[in-house]
Amino acid sequence: MVVVALIAAGLYWRSRSAAPVATPATLSEKDTVVLADFDNKTGDAVFDDALKQALAVQLGQSPFINILSDRKVSETLRLMGSQPNSRITPDVARELCVRTGSKAIVLGSISNLGSQYVIGVDAVGCSSGDTLAKEQEEASGKPDVLKALSRAAASLRTKLGESLASVQKFDVPVEATTPSLEALKAYSMGITTGRTKGDAEAIPFMKRAIELDSNFAMAYVGLAVEYANLGRASLAAENAKKAYDLRDRVSERERYRISAFYFQYVTGEVEKATEAYELWAKSYPRDPVPHGNLGYIYSALGQYDKSIVETEAHQHLEPSIVGYGNLAGTYINVNRLKEARQTIAEAQQKNFDGLTIRGDLYALAFLSGDAADMDRQVAWGAGRPGEEDQMLNGHADTQAYYGRLEKARDLARRAADSAVRSDAKETGAQWIAFQAVREAEIGNPTAARQAVAHALALAPGRDVKVIAAVALARTGETSQSKSILDALQKSEPSNTYLKVYWFPVIEASLALAQQAPDRAIIALEPSLPYELGAPPPGISMYPPYLRGLAYLAQKNGPAAAAEFLKFADHPGVIQNFLLGSLARLQLGRAYAISGDTAKAKAAYQDFLTLWKDADPGIPILTEAKAEYAKLQ
């Protein structure tokens, strides 16, 4: 079961600030500061969250000032026995500062006399209590408060050691991001709610921020993240596009964030997304986010060594549940199971628990044959929106792997129903489409086509169409599959994952259905460097499976065997996907064509042992038994 988190968990994309300060008189390059909540003495509630968020935006665009992230604040509050959404008073900020080894706290305040406002920003050493820097600005009215705060923050940055040239270069005024205090407050509430209650609860706040300011780029990308985390890919792309169109209104850090999200999830141009992450990491070397997301990209492309390097860099800067889950998952991919278990154990020692960790535990249980532990992980997901459906679909894969198709169908249906209940129709449609692929591969074309029709009727999103096109081609329904492929190639001309993996898979499937194995092998050539990856929507190792089938059709037994042996060589990649067990049958067929009866018998026996409890009457099982009997 593969659960790689980026959008699935969303944590890499949470709005945060980062990167160190540099002046020997105040802060060193590796120091971190903690933002306290604003001391609002005006009685006007609009300032409560808006000004802290505005200050975070202002200080966060600095490549030198590293602010303790919201995620780290929440984790530390839990260790302190407090709720993750507790107010960060000066005393709480000092304790956070000491516990996290930070250097200073930043205190903000606002007071008024009539229509005049005074904004203060102080940096105080958390151990000594000494004031490191102090700024005060006046505003002639509420509309000028954000401008005054921007001036105070810029001056504070220079006093904390940042060069004037840097401050001038990285100084987009917060009022350019949004001039609306109300919008900023709603956005801040969305960030906090998403972190503490989940994505679905955060959406109304992000929508409200956009209603108040239709040019609020950060709110659009925040909403895009929430939708993506809920599997609503079309709405995620729509809002990411709006954020990208408004990217000139944000700081350089946010521009990197928006651009990377846009290229990765709207156009699918992974090369450009990678470039944005690399520039982000270079400009903000203390920010873990670009490293974590580069790790995700490399993993999807099957470049696991690179993925480990980047994910470890993320964890070195700021350990997180997503980082632990992705690192353990990549260790599983490269069969370093001991290190995967150690990584999960370290996460659990820090009380991290969530979908990525549970998905890794499920994968380890599957690889070790521990059915009881697999059941425990699935039970953990029960009743958890956005997580239950993932675990159920993973369990459906396992049932199909062993030929228990009725159970797989039931689990796929339950997974889809769970996703729909969570307002994630696109995700639910994907689970139905995955079942269509299972039906196609075991020889049930009618059931496969019915599942495709159901999935497309529920939510005909891009990823659903990709899976549907594969399933249709594998059942011989070439006309509809080709129509979907043509439309995708027209609408997604730059999408890296589609160009190097999924388009070749669909084209090869069509060629095989048309008895053209030579064309199938040629179609799969672009996938060769990436065939061990699992690009979204995520079915591992389809290219070598189809290439093996093409060689079988050519009666080239040795070449076919070489392809199917890749599955035995990479158990951590294929895991519990149906193709992993079917590859054993196909290996037997390859050996039979080659005239190696002993190896053919062994491979058939291996498959039939895996499927000893399979449902009766499955077409591919009936074929396998008949073929095996002829070898006796």
Predicted regions and their residues:
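Glycine-centered coil turns and helix-coil junctions that link the paired helices
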Residues: L230, Y262-V266, A363-F366, G533, ...
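Helix-coil-helix junctions within alpha-helical repeat/solenoid scaffolds
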Residues: M391-L392, D397-F577, L582-L610, P619-L631
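Amphipathic alpha-helical repeat scaffolds
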Residues: I191, K207, V225, F261-Y262, ...
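Position-specific recognition of the canonical hydrophobic site in helix A of tetratricopeptide repeat
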Residues: G194, A228, Q264-Y265, S299, ...
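TPR-adjacent "capping" and linker segments in tetratricopeptide-repeat scaffold/adaptor proteins
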Residues: A22-L27, V167-Y187, D245-R255, G381, ...
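Acidic, proline/glycine-rich low-complexity intrinsically disordered segments
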Residues: M1-E346, K350-G354, A372, P385, ...
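Short coil loop/turn residues that delineate tetratricopeptide repeat
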Residues: N215, D248-E252, R286, P319-I321, ...
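Canonical tetratricopeptide repeat
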Residues: A186, Y220, R253-R257, H291, ...
